[in-house]
């Protein structure tokens, strides 16, 4: 399979730069699969996993809190708000954040509090989904 240059960067640092055969990311309108030669594209990403399939079948999974995906003929760039390796996610902390967000949504003091709690809930659920996908990938090997 043909490859392309893939870069995943956040405001803090570059987290990945290398050759990839495929990239799958969570766009605001659904998951996107990118291969070499994909039509140029600029789209917003929602919190969730970004999966990079390297040459030889190796897969690397990252978690982004949102950002943008830019596709050019030979280069794909993920410009993330924040990004981390999926292996570095803390499942217990994500579950605790999910529980706190649910509680805050129930105890809403204002629309702003509810909106903030809903955003925190979406991020915690996305982290848990990323961890689950990583776990499922590991059990298939």
Swiss-Prot record:
Subcellular location per UniProt equals: Cell inner membrane
Q: Which InterPro entries match?
A: ATP_F1_dsu/esu_C_sf, ATP_synth_F1_dsu/esu, ATP_synth_F1_dsu/esu_N, ATP_synth_F1_esu_C, ATPsynth_dsu/esu_N
SUPFAM superfamilies the UniProt entry points to: Epsilon subunit of F1F0-ATP synthase C-terminal domain (SSF46604), Epsilon subunit of F1F0-ATP synthase N-terminal domain (SSF51344)
- The highest taxon in the source lineage is Bacteria
Q: List the disulfide bonds.
A: none
Q: Tell me, in one coarse class, where this protein mainly resides.
A: membrane
- Keyword annotations of the record: ATP synthesis, Cell inner membrane, Cell membrane, CF(1), Hydrogen ion transport, Ion transport, Membrane, Transport
Q: Does the keyword RNA-binding apply?
A: no
Q: Which GO terms describe its molecular function?
A: ATP binding; proton-transporting ATP synthase activity, rotational mechanism
Is Iron tagged as a keyword? no
CDD domains registered for this protein in UniProt: F1-ATPase_delta
Membrane topology, as annotated, equals: Peripheral membrane protein
- What is the recorded function of this protein according to its Swiss-Prot or TrEMBL entry? Produces ATP from ADP in the presence of a proton gradient across the membrane.
Q: Which family does it belong to?
A: Belongs to the ATPase epsilon chain family.
Q: List the protein's name.
A: ATP synthase epsilon chain
Instruction: Name the source organism.
Output: Chromohalobacter salexigens (strain ATCC BAA-138 / DSM 3043 / CIP 106854 / NCIMB 13768 / 1H11)
């Amino acid at each position: 399979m043909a490859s392309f240059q893939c870069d995943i960067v956040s405001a803090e640092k570059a987290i990945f730069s290398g050759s990839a055969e495929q990239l799958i990311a969570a766009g605001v309108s659904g998951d996107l699969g990118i291969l070499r030669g994909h039509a140029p594209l600029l789209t917003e990403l929602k919190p969730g996993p970004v999966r990079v399939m390297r040459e030889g079948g190796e897969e690397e999974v990252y978690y982004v809190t949102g950002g943008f995906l830019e596709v050019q003929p030979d280069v794909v760039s993920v410009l993330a708000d924040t990004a981390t390796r999926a292996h570095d996610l803390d499942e217990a902390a994500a579950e605790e954040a999910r529980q706190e967000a649910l509680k805050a949504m129930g105890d809403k003091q204002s629309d702003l509090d509810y909106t903030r709690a809903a955003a925190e809930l979406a991020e915690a659920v996305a982290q848990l989904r990323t961890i689950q996908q990583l776990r499922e990938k590991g059990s298939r090997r």
